[in-house]
Amino acid sequence: MLTMDDIVREGHPALREVASEVTFPLSDEEKKLGHDMLEFLINSQDEELAEKYGLRGGVGIAAPQLAVTKRILAIHVHDEKDRLYSYVLYNPKIRSHSVQQACLSGGEGCLSVDREVPGYVVRSERVTIDAFDENGIPLKLRFKDYPAIVVQHEIDHLNGIMFYDHINKENPSYLPPDVDVFG
């Protein structure tokens, strides 16, 4: 079972590397990593387990956060209608994105960042993702609003990008016009 001790923190070189694609069939280790990542997210959202094991609540995690520079991510997040998006994605890529942008009112956080980073992180409000499941079956997934923000945050990790790289350095509270704000 993964715990917070397994998650590398900002400054670790794996967080700034571009992760490598996995090849299919996946190794047992790659499959286990995906399962463990999703299990961590589920456990972190369970109050009892989170308290017992000292887990910070998370809705997404990427392999580089575990010092594994492979293109694997997991998300476990509900949208505003309480629909669950729970996936382990291998080699995910953004196929298309909306022109409309969105951000979270309180900014973003990250399991690899142990400090508050004020500022808006503006992202696409909708994205279509191409990825594979653990059996190598191609997936085409559409995300909007909060789940879209989460999956973009995790794909950024696969490209060596941290959420605060998107924040306006001169004016972190600057919000471009017509950006939808959630939360």
UniProtKB/Swiss-Prot annotation:
What InterPro entries is this protein classified in?
Peptide_deformylase, Peptide_deformylase_sf
Q: Which residues form the active site?
A: 154
The entry's free-text remark on the cofactor is: Binds 1 Fe(2+) ion.
SUPFAM superfamilies registered for this protein in UniProt: Peptide deformylase
Which Pfam families has this protein been placed in? Pep_deformylase (PF01327)
GO function terms (MF aspect): metal ion binding; peptide deformylase activity
GO BP, one example?
translation
Which UniProt keywords are present, listed alphabetically? Hydrolase, Iron, Metal-binding, Protein biosynthesis
Chemical reaction(s) catalysed: N-terminal N-formyl-L-methionyl-[peptide] + H2O = N-terminal L-methionyl-[peptide] + formate
Signal peptide feature range: none
Q: Which annotated residues bind Fe cation?
A: 110, 153, 157
EC number(s) per entry: 3.5.1.88
What cofactor does this chain's UniProt record say it requires?
Fe(2+)
Q: Which NCBIfam families match?
A: pept_deformyl
Question: Per its database record, what is this protein's job?
Answer: Removes the formyl group from the N-terminal Met of newly synthesized proteins. Requires at least a dipeptide for an efficient rate of reaction. N-terminal L-methionine is a prerequisite for activity but the enzyme has broad specificity at other positions.
What family does the database annotate? Belongs to the polypeptide deformylase family.
Give the matching HAMAP family.
Answer: Pep_deformylase
This chain belongs to which protein, by name? Peptide deformylase
Its gene is: def
